Every structure is written in C-alpha cells, then in structure tokens.
Amino acid sequence: MIKKTILNDTHRALGAKMVDFSGWEMPIHYGSQIDEHHHVRRNAGIFDVSHMTVIDLHGTQVRPLLRRLLANSVDKLKVPGKALYSCMLNPQGGVIDDLIVYYLREDYFRFIVNAATREKDLAWINTQASAFNVRVEERADLAMLAVQGPAARAQVTNLLAETHRDAVEKLGRFAALEVASHSKKTLFISRTGYTGEDGFEILLPQEETITLWNALLKTGVKPIGLGARDTLRLEAGMNLYGQDMDEQVSPYEAALGWTVMLDEGRNFIGRNVLEQQKTNGVSRQMIGLLMDEKGVLRHGQKVLTAQGEGHILSGTFSPTLNKAIGFARVPAGKPSEVRVNIRDRAIPVRVVKFPFVREGQTQPNIFD
C-alpha cells in the first residue's frame, strides 16, 4: 500500500501532480518544474521530504559502532550538532546507502537515510548494532521539510522566536540545533540540503508540519516538487542512490572517494576492498558530461570513450545552463573524445568537472 506524508492533502490543494516515489505518493511538481527550479536558485523553495527515514542510535557504544559502520570517520564529530556525510558499505566495498549522521551526545547519534532503502538499512544497522548493545529507533513520528535557496535561511529565521534567531543565524554548514517552535514543540534545524543552495532541513513533529508549511508559504517561499529537486541536485553534482551508485559500486567508482577515510586503526566494513582500490585503482569512474547540441541526456544511454563503453547514470536538461548535463560511469583512464548514443546517433559531449552549478553560479570550468 502506498504511503502518504502528513502534507498529502495540502499538496493536492496546491495543484500538485502526485507520483509514486519509492512507495510514497509525492509531488513531482505544482505547475512548471523549470519555474520551480529557478525559484530555488534565485529565492527560496520548500520541499516535503518526509519520506526520508530518520533513525536515532542510543547507547554508550554508538561511536564504536559508527567507526565500524561508516566509511567516513565519525571521529571528526566532536561538537554536538555537527553532521557528516558518509557511505555505509557492504564487505565487498559496495554502497548500501549514503546518509547524513548527526552527533547529538556521546550516547546519541542520528541518521538521515534514503526512503527507498529504509527496510534494507534498518535491517543492516540493527544487525551491526547488536554486537555493540546500541538501541536503534526509527523516528516515524517526525516529518521533514527542506527550505532551500539564497533567501531560505532568512525566511525560516524570521518565523522563529527572537530568543532562537541569533543561534540559528550563526549555525554553520553541516551543523544542527534544536529550538522550540511557537507552540513549544521541538524543531531540529540543520544547515544542510540537496540542491547546491544554502538553506535548512527541518525535522519536526508530524502534527506541527502543516502549520510550519503554511507559515513559510505566507512569507513567499514557493512549494517545490521532486522533479526540480532532481534537476537541482544534478546541477549541484550530488549523487542519487540507486541511480548513480548501489551495492555493486564502491565510493571510488562513484566520485565519492572524498568521503572515505582510511584512518589508522579503524576497521570499517569494506575497508580491505577500498584499500586495494586506493592502491591499485579502479576499473570504472564517474564523470560529468555536458552536451552542447540540443537534446537531453537520459539514464541508460550508451557512452563511447577512448577507453571503451559506459552509460549515463543521471541525465537531465539543466535549466540554469540551458543545456543537457549528466553523470556517466565509464572505463578508467582519460576519456578523450566522448560521444553519447542518442537515437542511433553518436552525439559529441564534453567531459566537465562537477558540480555544474553551486549557489546559483555556473562553475568556471563549465564553459571553458
């Protein structure tokens, strides 16, 4: 049976087109997906991301568990509220999921994981946690909103009680804090996002969600669907699990080597394989592509390089660049001239370093 967020009726009242996304009925757009995309780049938009899975980890051995569970080093988290992006790997070095972990107390950490991997992630985390006597708690009582764009932080901060505004305004990137709403309910506000823009992601009690959503709409924040969320994240060079990487792909094959910490004395799951890949290299790589000709890059299209064939992982029309962009997995080595097979034509594309766009600005290498 398809799941619905607390905002389902609200989305429908706003004219949203609803689609099945990982078993959840979610808004794909409220009208023009391109207009929604531009509004986030230029102003502020709000996303219902309550389909995401929130998992709290409790116990005195949470940090040792996470040193084992995550490819990135949780030892970087020393200040309560700080967050870290990491992959969770299987013994073969494949990505079970990518996630954000928050350090709240030494005996209390929080995960935000993908909706599509909920059951798999919970099973894997519970299995690993049992040896550390860590309690795993799914927080289905919480909803999640993302407010993104250059005006997003100001719009959210203005709705808070004055006693909290200063702390929220000073919140650093990849950090979170808890504040009280006007009805004295706890809001968990983090300066994170999936768009390449500044902004906040907010966890809050289900019953508070509609009130906050409507309050933000009254300030001029626009509702944004998952369609624009996808084009925004692709412009920002952010991976989508299940499309850009999965359990058959290691972080080094998904342009996520920067999230791997081979720190001394930490035997995380999959480390042996990643050490070999670090030393010997990998046979595949993920690259960014930009197409100057008219057309759109799509998942699954064949990519031809000097080193052999690959395929498009994520592809879309970029509203900011007014060109087609994409990620591709291709054989390792210098790709040289690259072409994409579109309707039996080998169309030339350029290899570019991503992100393509960050905080509204086209990155300098894109049109070199």
Curated annotation (Swiss-Prot):
GO BP annotation list: glycine decarboxylation via glycine cleavage system
Any one Gene Ontology cellular component term annotated for this protein: cytosol
Gene Ontology MF terms in the entry: aminomethyltransferase activity; transaminase activity
Keywords from the named record: Aminotransferase, Transferase
Pfam families per the UniProt record, alphabetical: GCV_T, GCV_T_C
Catalytic activity, as annotated: N(6)-[(R)-S(8)-aminomethyldihydrolipoyl]-L-lysyl-[protein] + (6S)-5,6,7,8-tetrahydrofolate = N(6)-[(R)-dihydrolipoyl]-L-lysyl-[protein] + (6R)-5,10-methylene-5,6,7,8-tetrahydrofolate + NH4(+)
Coiled-coil annotated residue ranges, if any: none
Protein origin, superkingdom: Bacteria
Record-listed E.C. numbers: 2.1.2.10
EC class of the enzyme, as a word: transferase
NCBIfam families given in the database record: gcvT, PRK00389.1
Subunit organization: The glycine cleavage system is composed of four proteins: P, T, L and H.
Similarity comment: Belongs to the GcvT family.
Record PANTHER family: AMINOMETHYLTRANSFERASE, AMINOMETHYLTRANSFERASE, MITOCHONDRIAL
HAMAP family xrefs: GcvT
Function: The glycine cleavage system catalyzes the degradation of glycine.
Protein name according to UniProt: Aminomethyltransferase
Species of provenance: Xylella fastidiosa (strain M12)
Recorded name of the encoding gene: gcvT
